[in-house]
Amino acid sequence: MKKFRTIALATLFAGNAMALDNVPESGFSWVGFAGMTVSNLKSAGLDPKMGVTFGAKVEYMLPSAYGTYLSAGIDWVHKGARDTYFNPTLNTDETFKVQAHYLEIPIHVGYRYNISDELGVYGEFGPYFAVGVTGKGKNKYEDLPDEHFMWFGKKYMWGNQKGIQRFDCGIGFRVGAEYKNMYSLTFGYDWGITDIYVDDYRTANPGLPKLKNRNMSLTFGYRF
């Protein structure tokens, strides 16, 4: 029995020592990334649209926190949506497309676990804050000239009334894996919680459902 206790204690201490060896080092680091997005507009009944994203973030691995870290970044995110349907008013098929480019600042808290000296996995979540930089849309008709419009600004698809605001915010998460503490592959998803219709437009059209951004991303990163 004494021999068994000795072996058990030795195994426990060895496991703890190995776990401590794999704890990430504390301090700051930078990560640059680029990849693809699949986005949509909730409650609009539209189809998702593919886009691109790129940016950089700074991470601070907290000391004596066993893998807990804070991160903040600045991302360029391409969002949008599309749909194809029959327009009974114009008696023709219509394809609606919108592209919106946002500058986003995600602020996350995360946890990283190093499986070995070369491979680590991580997950993080938190809010994001975004501003629409540019956006455009198009109504493409089968038998009529195409109609182009600005997504942000006074000229909107429903006349000259400003309909879409530039500000957006929401919450999101990221999960991924990193190789040799340099190369990473990350999957993310963001839920917009802001109704992006302008208040005046919402008041003038009370029957409209709330319009919110949804965005999924897959990115490759490099740690500096």
Show which residues each predicted segment covers.
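Structural signature of outer-membrane beta-barrel domains
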Residues: 37-41, 77-81, 128-134, 190-196
